Amino acid sequence: MTDKYKERRFDTYGYEKIDKEVLESIEYEYPEKNTIVEYITNEFSSVCPWTGLPDNAKLTIRYIPSKKLVELKSLKYYLTSYRNVGILQEHAINRILDDLVELLQPKFMEIIGEFQERGGIATRIVAKYEKEK
């Protein structure tokens, strides 16, 4: 029996398709407080860089704002830009953290990616940033 799937592959895009420029921020009126802001979506997806198969995840973005909040529509477009990008799960979560920290300069930020099982293994990635004191 031959492996008819051995050479099968779906096209993927490179990192240049991640649309960081779509991200926008809005001013935060309570920078003196340590309010925790949390966004959760079950719709995050990227693709495996080797097979092109989808990697779907629940994504939690948790942060303590300094002077800015992320504008939610821009966040949705940004996250959707990962849809056909071939990127490792661990790299995607760290890239999201880096891009949001650059935009918002928060006091603290944590990105959690809970990826659906593949091959019987579920992956949970936690990337953190804390502003130096």
Swiss-Prot record:
One of its GO terms (cellular component) is cytoplasm. It is found in: Cytoplasm. Substrate binds at V70, E71, L72, Q89, E90. Catalyzes the NADPH-dependent reduction of 7-cyano-7-deazaguanine (preQ0) to 7-aminomethyl-7-deazaguanine (preQ1). It comes from the Bacteria. Belongs to the GTP cyclohydrolase I family. QueF type 1 subfamily. Its EC number is 1.7.1.13. It comes from Thermoanaerobacter pseudethanolicus (strain ATCC 33223 / 39E) (Clostridium thermohydrosulfuricum). Gene3D superfamilies: 3.30.1130.10. SUPFAM superfamilies: Tetrahydrobiopterin biosynthesis enzymes-like (SSF55620). Pathway: tRNA modification; tRNA-queuosine biosynthesis. GO terms for molecular function: preQ1 synthase activity. Its main location: cytoplasm. It catalyses: 7-aminomethyl-7-carbaguanine + 2 NADP(+) = 7-cyano-7-deazaguanine + 2 NADPH + 3 H(+). This is NADPH-dependent 7-cyano-7-deazaguanine reductase. The lineage of its organism: Bacteria, Bacillati, Bacillota, Clostridia, Thermoanaerobacterales. Pfam families: QueF (PF14489).
